[in-house]
Amino acid sequence: MTILVDTNIILDIFMDRKPYAEEAKTIMEKCVDGEIIGYLAAHTIPNLFYILRKAYSQKERRMLIRNLCDVFRISDLNAEKIISAVEKEHFADFEDCLQEECAVEVLADYIVTRNPDDYRMSRIKVITPGDFVKLL
């Protein structure tokens, strides 16, 4: 099974956001074990680096990003995907639309997110971490 993991799931882990962190950690562990193939969208990486700046030093953030790249595959972003996302006016959030473009590219079975309503028009099935963990 292949999934694209939304940025908020990774933030749940690194910021230990209760009660979401445990389900997020379970998903990450399944990716580490190779039970599922996990992807992050390319733009998730700089977003994480920026958002985590208040909680982690630059050195720590670099190590976290390096470790993420060992666990997850990274879906590329190119001009074609960006233009496709820009033209989808039915997606209110441009960043979510980019995530969906990346999920389509990698043939993901699911986009795992805590914000499923943001993906109502997604071509890929969307699932919450809790519901995804129940599938495992």
PLM region spans:
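Acidic, PIN/NYN-like endoribonuclease modules and their adjacent C-terminal/linker elements
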Residues: 2, 104-136
